[in-house]
Structures are given as structure tokens and as C-alpha cells.
Amino acid sequence: MEITDVRVRKLNEEGKMKAVVSVTFDNEFVVHDIKVIEGQNGLFIAMPSRKTPEGEFKDIAHPINSDTRNRLQSAILKEYEKAKEQEAAHKE
């Protein structure tokens, strides 16, 4: 499965959630609401999730192996950095 598009839909400077992203695979399937989060060890992605009645968050869709997760995270963070640079350039 190839990542064919990454769209950074919302950028936040405040708080730990830095962006909301949509990713398209093979120009046929899209996953919305992937979050870019700033953690203690840097940026990471959080897949779309829902809250259970017990208060736990369960992923709705997620990679099932670490290689795919790493490729997805790399592609998202690359586009996030581009979007941040473009936003900074517009502010100048």
C-alpha cells in the first residue's frame, strides 16, 4: 500500500496536539483525523480513536506492523514540517 497524499488540515501552535492530518493510500482510501502530538521524546502520530464507556481510547484504524507505522509517521511528519514552514513564511 502506497501513501499517495498527506494533507495537514489544521495546525496548532498551542498545546500538545500540533496538527490534524488526512492520509490517502493508493489514491483510493483515506484515513482522517490522524493527530500529530508533541511528546517528551519529540513528535509522534496518534491514529483516529474513540472513547469506550470505560474511558479507554481505542484506535479505529491503525497499522498492524512497525514498518508500516514508521513509514506512515515519517510521511506525516515530513508534510507537517513543510506546512509549518509555509505557515511561517506567510506570517512574514
From Swiss-Prot:
It comes from the Bacteria. It holds the Pfam family SpoVG. GO terms for biological process: division septum assembly; sporulation resulting in formation of a cellular spore. The keyword Iron-sulfur does not apply. Gene3D superfamilies: Stage V sporulation protein G (3.30.1120.40). Keywords: Cell cycle, Cell division, Septation. InterPro entries: SpoVG, SpoVG_sf. PANTHER family: SEPTATION PROTEIN SPOVG-RELATED. Could be involved in septation. Belongs to the SpoVG family. HAMAP family: SpoVG. This is Putative septation protein SpoVG. It comes from Thermoanaerobacter pseudethanolicus (strain ATCC 33223 / 39E). The lineage of its organism: Bacteria, Bacillati, Bacillota, Clostridia, Thermoanaerobacterales. The gene is spoVG.
